[in-house]
Amino acid sequence: MSDNAQLSGLCDRFRGFYPVVIDVETAGFNAKTDALLEIAAITLKMDEQGWLMPDTTLHFHVEPFAGANLQPEALAFNGIDPSNPLRGAVSEYEALHAIFKMVRKGIKDSGCSRAIMVAHNATFDHSFMMAAAERASLKRNPFHPFVTFDTAALSGLALGQTVLSKACLAAGMEFDGEKAHSALYDTERTAVLFCEIVNRWKRLGGWPLPLPTDK
């Protein structure tokens, strides 16, 4: 096993995975048929003492793909008007191309091997991002095709809460319900929450793992 002093790097913490926090806002629940309307991504970094923290942020409003379903209930829930020109929306290709480029650079700079999505109820966000990447014919997808870090599950374990707002409050963080269901705000809160859970485990002595003793 590596010496503990060598386990403070991001590449050592998650088996070579590079965690990237993602949140999406959509026009429904079906990743294949319903529109992706907004996406934000935040990369993470570690300081020299091994504490995890947010790093770089990208955020895009996204144009519905041709033929996409726009479920009225979903639009009422997130308050997005896809036809509003003030959104400054870009294509799925433009949004994901920029995010993937940022992520690939982070993987290289940190010495990691592949990105892993961090999200709250991650299956949902992962399915929409992967479906959009497929529609956009983006071949160099840096994210693992199925492995994720789900902060809903991690929060249930560490904090006894699974709802994002309640988990943030349980962790001693602020959460503004008026800003919820914005991809940018939810991603920022999820990033801070994930870092707090990882860092709390370190403060409690759970990381680095103890070195094996000779018998």
UniProtKB/Swiss-Prot annotation:
Alphabetical list of SMART domains matching this protein: EXOIII (SM00479)
GO CC annotation, single: cytosol
Family designation: Belongs to the RNase T family.
HAMAP family, A to Z: RNase_T (MF_00157)
Quaternary structure annotation from Swiss-Prot or TrEMBL: Homodimer.
Entry protein name: Ribonuclease T
InterPro entries in alphabetical order: Exonuclease_RNaseT/DNA_pol3, RNase_T, RNaseH-like_sf, RNaseH_sf
UniProt-listed Enzyme Commission number(s): 3.1.13.-
Physiological role: Trims short 3' overhangs of a variety of RNA species, leaving a one or two nucleotide 3' overhang. Responsible for the end-turnover of tRNA: specifically removes the terminal AMP residue from uncharged tRNA (tRNA-C-C-A). Also appears to be involved in tRNA biosynthesis.
Site description Important for substrate binding and specificity, residues in chain: 29, 77, 124, 146
Ranges where the Exonuclease domain occurs: 20-194
Binding site for Mg(2+) 1: 23
Binding, Mg(2+) 2: 23, 25, 181, 186
Biological processes, Gene Ontology terms: DNA replication proofreading; tRNA processing
Keywords linked to the UniProt accession: Exonuclease, Hydrolase, Magnesium, Metal-binding, Nuclease, tRNA processing
A GO molecular-function descriptor: 3'-5' exonuclease activity
PANTHER family: DNA POLYMERASE III SUBUNIT EPSILON (PTHR30231), RIBONUCLEASE T (PTHR30231:SF2)
Domain of life: Bacteria
Cofactor(s) needed by this chain: Mg(2+)
Cofactor: binding comment: Binds two Mg(2+) per subunit. The active form of the enzyme binds two Mg(2+) ions in its active site. The first Mg(2+) forms only one salt bridge with the protein.
Active site per database record: 181 (proton donor/acceptor)
